[in-house]
């Protein structure tokens, strides 16, 4: 995918990749694919064109660099990623760690959005009044300007955000859901999940308050 300042063009590109994304998805179970399609279309048709930002920018002081100069870093956090990983149970022992394949940047739209975030951060840094107090960019540096080079920088520096969620989605069972609208696990008796894993999509917000809301509502018998 190329670089897009026009969100409608990006949206059409994302929608055109739905079939190939489903073909390359980690599970080919028909129900899971239906759920993936529903979430994908929600992302592309509602979130992408909404006033809610697709990337969060965090500006913070990072101390002195090797030359003794003070540095400022900009962190970009993708809010509604299209890439989806998979969590595997490895044994029947609840104390054994599962196998996690996050598959970050496996969807080209995520690469495009992160690349645009790098360019936008640079634009902010070269615009007054911030530009009047900033020196030279140190990472990745001005020489990294071609899209392919920016993509390589992103791939080698990306990290996970502190919002683990979405592994036990609240969706209809025929769409691969794990819990119903009352937070009960399908196929089990009176077993509920009340944590961030039931959110089917990432929020452009911190997940902890949403967990408190779920837990509070359940404690009052609303679920």
Model-derived segments and their meaning:
Residues 2-204, 209-210, 218-223:
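FAD-dependent oxidoreductase catalytic-site/capping-region signature
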């Amino acid at each position: 995918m190329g670089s897009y300042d026009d969100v409608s063009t990006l949206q059409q590109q994302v929608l055109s990749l739905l079939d190939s994304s489903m073909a390359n998805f980690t599970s080919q179970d028909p129900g899971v694919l239906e759920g993936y399609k529903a979430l994908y279309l929600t992302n592309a048709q509602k979130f992408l064109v909404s006033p809610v930002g697709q990337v969060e920018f965090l500006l913070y002081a990072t101390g002195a660099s090797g030359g003794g100069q003070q540095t400022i870093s900009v962190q970009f956090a993708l809010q509604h990623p299209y890439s989806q990983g998979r969590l595997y149970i490895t044994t029947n022992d609840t104390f054994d760690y599962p196998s996690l394949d996050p598959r970050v940047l496996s969807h080209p739209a995520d690469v495009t959005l992160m690349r645009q975030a790098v360019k936008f951060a640079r634009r902010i840094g070269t615009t007054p009044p911030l530009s009047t107090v900033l020196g030279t960019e140190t990472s990745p540096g001005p020489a990294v300007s071609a899209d392919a080079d920016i993509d390589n920088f992103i791939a080698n520096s990306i990290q996970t955000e502190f919002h683990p969620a979405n592994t036990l989605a609240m969706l209809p069972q025929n769409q691969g859901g794990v819990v119903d609208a009352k937070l009960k696990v399908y196929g089990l008796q009176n077993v509920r999940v009340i944590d961030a894993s039931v959110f089917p999509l990432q929020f452009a917000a911190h997940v902890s308050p949403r967990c408190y809301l779920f837990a509070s509502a359940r404690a009052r018998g609303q679920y």
